[in-house]
Amino acid sequence: MKDYKSTLNMPTTGFEMRANLNVKEPKIQQFWVEHQIYEKLLTKNKDKKPFILHDGPPYANGNIHIGHALNKILKDFVVSYHNMNNYYSPYIPGWDTHGLPIEVALSKKIKLSNLSVNERREQCKKYALEQVNNQIQQFLRLGMISDFKQRYLTLDHNYEIDQLKLFTYMLKKGFIYQDFKPVFWSWSSQTALAESEIEYADRQSSAIYVKMKVVDHNDLFTDKPTSLVIWTTTPWTLPANLAIAIHPELVYSLIEYKNENYIIAKPLVETFVKKVGFEDYKWIKDFKANTLEKIKYISPISKKHAFVIMDEYVSANDGTGLVHNAPAFGLEDYYACKKYGIETVVMIDQFGKYNALVNDLELENMFYEDANQVILNRLMNEHLLIHHEVITHSVAHDWRTKKPVMYRATKQWFVSIEKILPNILQTLNNDVKSTSFRGIERMHEMIVNRKEWCISRQRVWGVPIPMIFDENHNAIMDHELVENIINVLNEKGVNAWFDLDVNAFLTPKYLSMKNKTFYKEKDIMDVWFDSGSSYNILGHYNLNYPADVYLEGYDQYRGWFNSSLITGTILNNRAPYKYLVAHGMVLDGEGYKMSKSKGNVVDPLDVCKIYGADVLRLWIANSDYQNDTRISEEILKQNAEIYRRIRNTLFKYSLSILNDFEPSVDFSFNVRQEEQFVLNEFNELHIKVIKAYENFDYQTVVKLFNKFILDLSSWYFENIKDDMYCLAINDPIRKQIQSAVYWILKNSLIDLTPIIPHTTEEAYSFLKDANKKESIRLEDFYDQSQFQFKKGIAHVKAFFSIKDQIFNELENARKNNILKKNNEAFVTIAKNLILDDYLINNPKLLAKWFGVAKIEFANNTNVANANFKKCLRCWNHFPDEEMYNDELSMNCYKVINKIK
């Protein structure tokens, strides 16, 4: 038996089935860098409409984690797509390079306390730049389009000056002020925090009911000992008690229990007595709140006399309706006491320890949480503790250190949000869209209840607050003076603030005041003020405000989205973004948060080593990223399987049958109806893909392509094999098939480049095309409107309407050993199944589409073995009249003769 394999057009390509992405991807990335593909892309698009994704700066500290990968790769999808679809879309990455984490990380390496302020700042800058350079290399490994040469750092001189100018503008407009009042204080970071830096976690606390003995009651009560009863979950604040607040509209009851009197808000009496076991209490009388105002009592720890005040913040929902007030450690307490002229005494220092103002030798220098038990013991010993229990409740924590925070009164700088809130809400509602139906709503929730933003921090590594104080330590709110400070810093560098004497920043007006002493502000600005002014960099690159899109994790609704919205609205009277896209967090395969202690951390660079960056990118594209998404070995394997289908079924097979095709010579849209059908199917896919990219919906892109490849491989690729392998190499039918496959392959490569750019670049390099670009990234998405294939498609659709039913019949025939392969089959099809006259009149074409030996139409559908002879070249089965001899069909014989 003769071997006819040498006469066939067997598929061949150098594009490997095995991806070896960990080896190939770095080489492809090097190709992009050496050939300046990013620069050429921007040059190509420079006159097109801009689409600007403004990069939210990650923190320059440590290696990138899987959350970084999710964020940066999503951004790369956005930028890559727009650059390939008629937009000018530069990607300018940024880094947040100031703040506490850098100081903390550096303190583990060197003793910062031994250095001067500027020496510490120089060390912080050096460390931050090292971290940026490290992260750049790691981000590049993910396959990002940017060359990272154009970037912004919050420590850049021009950036800092822009930020200082923004501060000055806000000061001029009356949005910035200084005040002394309780703010969130992180003893673990030794600095004030803004609300956006607070996260809440459950924590156990002591909840206590405490007696505060009345000493002067103007004969309101009986002669029996009388106490005001308070409830608190912060026993450590009792040494700072300076008042008890009651609600002016509440009624208060005097009750008796075991020869002692107690005052409780009337609506809470029953709850109180059940909780503390006073069931057999005796009601004595009720009072209006104003009759209790100014009644004196003994503060239980300090033993000083204090008095009752009234304020509407007091609630009858829990506790006793009497609130212990420590104005240094509660904002409501502070405002309530301020109305009565009660002085605020801050008896806890920046480290969370009692200072000398506590006037208590046992408590002085004690950490505030450690004092809880000491205070409980004293209350018990003095019979002032009515009831004690441990409760679990939500407590504010420093989101960096994860330690609890307190309210602590300090002098701080604030931005008034109340003053700009109407403008913020207007621009949020009118100018901003979001991919999430709750996106704008969440932003609204985050901003509407914020009265102010504390922007001062008690650290050294950051942008200084450019304010000067007089000899009474009052801030000089002189705009000309502040502008002069910024001019000096612009000339000499921001470090000059920490290095030069105050006189270097004074204007002649103040220098002439020879007998006056002036002081520089020591605080720096909140890093959220740093990053919240990052939109200023757009102007340096001739890009317009606002940016088209901000894309970050959903935690940035309270962070960068929020701070940028506040400053941007103050400066430009509209939000700095048109579109908000928020992604969730990355969890492990079981849905748990990743942590080193659990051993469930997934390193994106390890994923790149094992699977390749393109599989990592495909996992991200294939995730519902707007919610928390999971990653595990099993999930990565599932996406690796999808990747293999794309690589081998679509890319490799298509390349292998295009090895003798030159588009500049052979390509044509004048193709058979089969090709028209698949081209039309691809065009419909392409339209949906473009829409999905526009909507930041990458999961739909993956699903669409996955289904298309399955459909393509299950019929069209199988159907064309005979023609591709067996027809003469230059047969017009082969060229029509290759034209369709070329078009689908090339545009699939383009469509998928935003998601798997390394693989599409590799496949593109094997695509024979005299007119192709230097890189796949320099290609453009095609205009789908040019496709109007209608003629002939209806016949293929009619075939598809019965395809599955006939294939099921063929499968049953194989199971019943009637057939070994479909091409042996003689199929009769019930006439009522197919309504297309063209197909009824062309049974040979229909047989070819079904891949069977013969088709006829009858009253019933049936599958039998045709018992035809097999051609040893094409392996199809033919009746005697279509065989040249016992080995070859007439078609194969003619082709071989042409080859000879």
Swiss-Prot record:
Binding-site residues for L-isoleucyl-5'-AMP, renumbered to this chain: 552
InterPro entries: aa-tRNA-synth_I_CS (IPR001412), aa-tRNA-synth_Ia (IPR002300), Anticodon_Ile_BEm (IPR033708), Ile-tRNA-ligase (IPR002301), Ile-tRNA-ligase_type1 (IPR023585), Ile-tRNA_ligase (IPR050081), M/V/L/I-tRNA-synth_anticd-bd (IPR013155), Rossmann-like_a/b/a_fold (IPR014729)
GO biological process: isoleucyl-tRNA aminoacylation
GO molecular function: aminoacyl-tRNA deacylase activity; ATP binding; isoleucine-tRNA ligase activity; tRNA binding
Known catalytic reactions: tRNA(Ile) + L-isoleucine + ATP = L-isoleucyl-tRNA(Ile) + AMP + diphosphate
Renumbered ranges of motif 'KMSKS' region: 593-597
Motif 'HIGH' region, residue numbers: 58-68
Alphabetical UniProt keywords: Aminoacyl-tRNA synthetase, ATP-binding, Cytoplasm, Ligase, Nucleotide-binding, Protein biosynthesis
E.C. no: 6.1.1.5
Entry's localization field: Cytoplasm
Major localization class: cytoplasm
Domain text: IleRS has two distinct active sites: one for aminoacylation and one for editing. The misactivated valine is translocated from the active site to the editing site, which sterically excludes the correctly activated isoleucine. The single editing site contains two valyl binding pockets, one specific for each substrate (Val-AMP or Val-tRNA(Ile)).
The family this protein is said to belong to: Belongs to the class-I aminoacyl-tRNA synthetase family. IleS type 1 subfamily.
Subunit structure and binding partners: Monomer.
Biological function: Catalyzes the attachment of isoleucine to tRNA(Ile). As IleRS can inadvertently accommodate and process structurally similar amino acids such as valine, to avoid such errors it has two additional distinct tRNA(Ile)-dependent editing activities. One activity is designated as 'pretransfer' editing and involves the hydrolysis of activated Val-AMP. The other activity is designated 'posttransfer' editing and involves deacylation of mischarged Val-tRNA(Ile).
Protein name: Isoleucine--tRNA ligase
Gene source species: Ureaplasma parvum serovar 3 (strain ATCC 700970)
Gene name for this UniProt entry: ileS
